[in-house]
Amino acid sequence: MKVDVLLGLQWGDEGKGKVVDVLTPKYDVVARFQGGPNAGHTLEFEGQKYVLRSIPSGIFQGNKVNIIGNGVVLDPALFKAEAEALEASGHPLKERLHISKKAHLILPTHRILDAAYEAAKGDAKVGTTGKGIGPTYTDKVSRSGVRVGDSLHNFDQKYAAAKARHEQILKSLNYEYDLAELEKAWLEGIEYLKQFHFVDSEHEVNNLLKDGKSVLCEGAQGTMLDIDFGSYPFVTSSNTVCAGACTGLGVAPNRIGEVYGIFKAYCTRVGAGPFPTELFDETGDKMCTLGHEFGSVTGRKRRCGWIDLVALKYSVMINGVTKLIMMKSDVLDTFETIKACVAYKVNGEEIDYFPYDITEGVEPVYAELPGWQTDMTKMQSEDEFPEEFNAYLTFLEEQLGVQIKIVSVGPDRAQTIERYTEE
């Protein structure tokens, strides 16, 4: 068996949570491979809305095995709150959720360091979510992090050493903080965390594959936030691309099967950083309002713009995407004209590739297509699609070179239409 990978192709917030929930009936296992509680996956079904930050989206599907891999960073306090809320709503976790011993822990002082570093940068700040993700990955790379498995052996000593080191840094930054409340909730989270199955996820995933089980790897954020390939330095601290599934779960590259790439019919971004197609007019405001574009974790208003096919082609290439999934098509239902960025103009020169140094000065070159101006939210099959919408799909497929297999026409899991079903 091979593992299939599901990931975002833009700047995050593409709708991965809903898609995982739609796809999971086909899989035995759902595994998160990177990121932390800075990104929320939103799912809606049966009139209920759920936001998952650390727990895999397969948790709503029967007896699936859900794995938090070694590439994930975990905040015990936030994990406890998330898990308890799920259990209270009738979704038991303890027998179905396995956590890698090698996953790194976000310490209370990591969150304070995150705020201190952002404050020190002034106008050059990245716009982090303040959840301590960057400092945690920094400790991981510098070989001084505290891992989930450490909670079982000499934990007090390891935690105290990391805390003391962080407090020295905070002292040098002259940053005032109050650790007591954060630490209290965090230590309670550690005790709660110990109630779950700690595993060597690399062995577990490979043994499941050997036993013929199907595995879906769930990414967080999006390709354009990847630490290596995103719009650096306005990126996250982990590899959000397909290769991150290998390092974040311990599976070999030749075990990768299908790669599902998710994108919105338009484009959004949260926080600072270049965004070539960003709209500052009524059109952008309309996208934001109709798409309810506010961060599921931070509540921050998302920046909105037309779809960027230069960046999207780049993402498809890097990830080896085999199937595309388009989200939030319904948000564009009332637009008379649809625009798509097909090239950039940089210093007067037109380019069709994503450059090394993408700056705020990049000017988008647009193709224009007629809007479908039809309410698609109640449609059940692609046979009902308006002619103009089909033309938009065809245009995107020609530009990207990959079929769009799934189209979302609303937030509920039922508002999902599969295409090419005869194949």
Language-model features: locations:
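Non-transmembrane, aqueous-exposed alpha-helical and coiled segments at domain scale
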Residues: 1-423
